[in-house]
Regions:
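Helix-to-beta-strand junctions that scaffold the AdoMet/dcAdoMet cofactor pocket
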Residues: 124-125, 138-140
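Conserved class I S-adenosyl-L-methionine
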Residues: 1-47, 58-62, 79-82, 86-90
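A short acidic, Gly/Pro-enriched loop at the edge of an enzyme's catalytic core
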Residues: 103-114
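A short SAM/SAH-binding and catalytic strip from SAM-dependent methyltransferases
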Residues: 113-127, 150
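Core SAM-dependent methyltransferase catalytic element
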Residues: 199-202, 224, 273-280
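Conserved catalytic/acceptor-binding region of the Class I
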Residues: 26, 128, 143-217
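Class I SAM-dependent methyltransferase SAM/SAH-binding core
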Residues: 48-105, 129
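C-terminal helical/coil "lid" or tail adjacent to the Rossmann-like core of SAM-dependent
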Residues: 3-8, 15-22, 205-263
């Protein structure tokens, strides 16, 4: 099977649909991570930046405010098309978007000063090959800065679903490179350091970042519940439950979220990621 074919199928189908439909809400929900990423990446007006797994373009367009040029790469055509529309509407001329698999894409060597990524580097079926390919696209003194999720247990916004599911079904252990591509593939800092070292990076640092996020960027209770349960990982967790029990799981989740709901604000939940930096 060609590299990342399963990921390409997913992100050009059901996985992308929810992100495209709710792009603005995802941007607001993830804003703390975007700010942390760009602060750690640093700002330089002469930088040429590569944004891998750029999705609908929020981080690419934000980076373009201070960079010479930013190229966003994603294998999802629907998300890249949305990112291009956003750039046109915002009249941001120094951002461009490419539909490509960063694991195998033929980057011009030494093109980019900086790699950034917001939750876009966990889905490679050959991570060493992917990070090596990306490193070759960086200049000899290039840098990398990205964010990736910590484990399921550290993310309240998903654990409340997992806890409800466990009342009816067993859940496997999630996370780690040994389990293949997925949301939690890079949840272990020791594995991140080893992986990046194998790909030729050094001076790797993994710093914990645990903000409170506003689920769906705010909204009423019903909308927030629907938004959460429509996402890829929540749907995956619900998939472990027999269909006859799913309504009960949803009721439990609704009750948990109702307890956390703030009128006029929305639902605040704890999240956890690693902010990773490295030298090419």
């Amino acid at each position: 099977m060609p590299a990342n074919e399963r990921q390409a199928e997913a992100w050009n189908g059901p996985e992308s649909a929810h992100f495209v439909a709710h792009a603005d809400r995802y941007d607001r929900q993830l804003e703390p991570f975007t700010q942390a990423l760009l602060e750690r990446a640093g700002r330089g007006t002469n930088q040429v930046v590569l944004d891998v797994g750029c999705g609908s373009g929020a981080t690419t367009l934000a980076a373009a405010a201070s960079a010479e040029r930013v190229v966003g790469v994603d294998l999802s055509q629907p998300l890249v098309e949305l990112a291009r529309r956003r750039a046109r509407v915002a009249r941001i001329a120094n951002a461009e978007f490419v539909i490509a698999d960063a694991q195998t894409h033929d980057f011009v060597a030494g093109t980019f000063d900086l790699l950034i990524s917001q939750f876009g580097l966990m889905f490679f079926d050959d991570p060493v090959r992917a990070f090596t390919n990306i490193r070759h696209a960086l200049t000899t003194d290039g840098r990398a800065a990205f964010v990736c999720w910590q484990g399921l247990h550290a993310n309240e916004w998903l654990m409340l679903i997992a806890d409800a599911v466990r009342r009816h079904a067993e859940l496997p252990e999630f996370g780690g490179l040994i389990r293949g591509p997925g949301m939690f593939a890079l949840c272990r800092p020791d594995e991140i350091t080893t992986l990046l070292g194998a790909a030729g990076f050094d001076q790797v640092e993994c710093d914990s970042y645990t903000p409170t996020i506003l689920l769906g960027g705010g909204g009423n209770l019903d909308d927030s519940v629907d938004f959460l349960l429509g996402g890829g990982m929540p749907r995956g967790l619900l998939g472990f439950v027999d269909p006859s029990d799913r309504n009960d799981v949803v009721r439990i989740v609704q009750a948990e979220l109702a307890d956390r709901y703030e009128e006029g604000v929305g639902i605040r939940l704890r999240a956890a990621a690693w902010v990773v930096t490295a030298q090419a």
